[in-house]
């Protein structure tokens, strides 16, 4: 489906829980606030089933920390049984070592691991947990079982800026496929932490100089740089960036049963919780959810627009 701004809707991003075993000071919480209501596996899979009718073929599981859901493996398996071409997950990696193989067997295609530091000291300052070594083990396990491409997310801020290039070196040594250098943006806890925002221009200019190839990704029109080692460095700058918004192809399912059309917006949402929890037949629920998706697509718009 194409929205009124000419943007295709291709990706469903599902927040499985707000609970997390880390305390990152800048967490955007998928732009969600409020109670930690958790949709059931059946609710999630029903929404995903309806989303398939709108040519959505990719699902990203997020949190909070999705590995804290005991039914995570079953959710992944259910999504693949629905026929999704690409099912991926973003995780902090703390529990990944023990789950990687099970997730691969269930059908998880690839994984993003958040790693915002390259030293135990900085890692603990950012996450509140002394778990750097355990996360590294989780990353290695993901590579070993074939959850590829394995991508590492690094939110650049004033506390870790000096570690960016060592992070690139670590990523190359680990053998991951790709890293994302992400701008800190004022969403969720990031609103309070935005004073730690750091401009990525100098970093990106240097990466472009040492790269052997530059690409522009369709999603968000993100710049990607291929290094001589083969590592791909993707630079993600969402804040006040109309180019980023013009390439957005996502819709979000929140933990409390809302279709969220934009990470930055709390007004452009469609509440579907009453449909999911109502005493309707599954056929009626599917019809009502389909209408909800149509409305969501109709109201979907870029948060940052070009000024004419």
From Swiss-Prot:
Binding-site residues, S-adenosyl-L-methionine: 64, 114
Catalysed reactions, as listed in the record: GTP + AH2 + S-adenosyl-L-methionine = (8S)-3',8-cyclo-7,8-dihydroguanosine 5'-triphosphate + 5'-deoxyadenosine + L-methionine + A + H(+)
Record-listed GTP binding positions: 13, 60, 90, 151, 250-252
Keyword flag 4Fe-4S: yes
Textual note on the cofactor: Binds 2 [4Fe-4S] clusters. Binds 1 [4Fe-4S] cluster coordinated with 3 cysteines and an exchangeable S-adenosyl-L-methionine and 1 [4Fe-4S] cluster coordinated with 3 cysteines and the GTP-derived substrate.
GO MF terms held by the record: 4 iron, 4 sulfur cluster binding; cyclic pyranopterin monophosphate synthase activity; GTP 3',8'-cyclase activity; GTP binding; metal ion binding; S-adenosyl-L-methionine binding
EC numbers on record: 4.1.99.22
Record keywords, A-Z: 4Fe-4S, GTP-binding, Iron, Iron-sulfur, Lyase, Metal-binding, Molybdenum cofactor biosynthesis, Nucleotide-binding, S-adenosyl-L-methionine
CDD domains, sorted: Radical_SAM, Twitch_MoaA
Keyword presence, Zinc-finger: no
Binding-site residues, [4Fe-4S] cluster 2: 245, 248, 262
Domain Radical SAM core: 4-224
The protein's required cofactors: [4Fe-4S] cluster
InterPro entries: Aldolase_TIM (IPR013785), Elp3/MiaA/NifB-like_rSAM (IPR006638), MoaA_arc (IPR013485), MoaA_twitch (IPR010505), MoCo_biosynth_MoaA/MoaC (IPR050105), rSAM (IPR007197)
Superkingdom of this protein's organism: Archaea
Pathway note: Cofactor biosynthesis; molybdopterin biosynthesis
Binding site for [4Fe-4S] cluster 1: 20, 24, 27
Biological process, per Gene Ontology: Mo-molybdopterin cofactor biosynthetic process
Gene3D superfamilies tied to this protein: Aldolase class I
Cited function: Catalyzes the cyclization of GTP to (8S)-3',8-cyclo-7,8-dihydroguanosine 5'-triphosphate.
Homology family: Belongs to the radical SAM superfamily. MoaA family.
Record protein name field: Probable GTP 3',8-cyclase
Organism per entry: Saccharolobus islandicus (strain Y.N.15.51 / Yellowstone #2)
Gene expressing this chain: moaA
């Amino acid at each position: 489906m194409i929205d009124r701004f000419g943007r295709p809707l291709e990706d469903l991003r599902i927040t499985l829980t707000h609970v997390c075993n880390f305390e990152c000071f800048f967490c955007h919480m998928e732009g969600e606030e409020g109670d930690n209501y958790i949709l059931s596996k059946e609710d999630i899979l029903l929404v995903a089933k309806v989303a398939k009718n709108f040519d959505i073929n990719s699902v990203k599981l997020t949190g909070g920390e999705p590995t804290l859901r005991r039914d995570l493996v079953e959710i992944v398996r259910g999504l693949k049984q629905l026929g999704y071409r690409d099912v991926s997950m973003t995780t902090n990696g703390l529990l990944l070592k023990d789950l990687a193989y099970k997730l691969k067997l269930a059908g998880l295609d690839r994984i993003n691991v958040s790693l915002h530091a390259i030293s135990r000291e900085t890692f603990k300052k950012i996450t509140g947990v002394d778990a750097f070594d355990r996360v590294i083990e989780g990353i290695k396990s993901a590579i070993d079982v074939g959850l590829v491409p394995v991508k590492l997310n690094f939110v650049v801020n004033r506390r870790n800026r000096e570690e960016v290039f060592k992070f690139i070196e670590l990523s190359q040594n680990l053998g991951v496929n790709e890293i994302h250098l992400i701008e800190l943006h004022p969403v969720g806890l990031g609103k309070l932490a935005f004073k730690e925002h750091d401009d990525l221009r100098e970093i990106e200019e240097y990466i472009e100089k040492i790269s052997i190839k530059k690409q522009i990704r369709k999603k968000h029109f993100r710049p990607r740089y291929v290094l001589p080692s083969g590592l791909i460095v993707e630079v993600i700058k969402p804040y006040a960036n109309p180019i980023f918004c013009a390439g957005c192809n996502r819709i979000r399912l929140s933990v409390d049963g809302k279709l969220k059309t934009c990470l930055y917006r709390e007004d452009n949402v469609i509440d579907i919780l009453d449909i999911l929890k109502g005493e309707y037949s599954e056929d009626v629920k599917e019809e009502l959810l389909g209408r909800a998706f149509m409305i969501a697509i109709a109201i979907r718009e870029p948060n940052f627009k070009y000024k004419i």
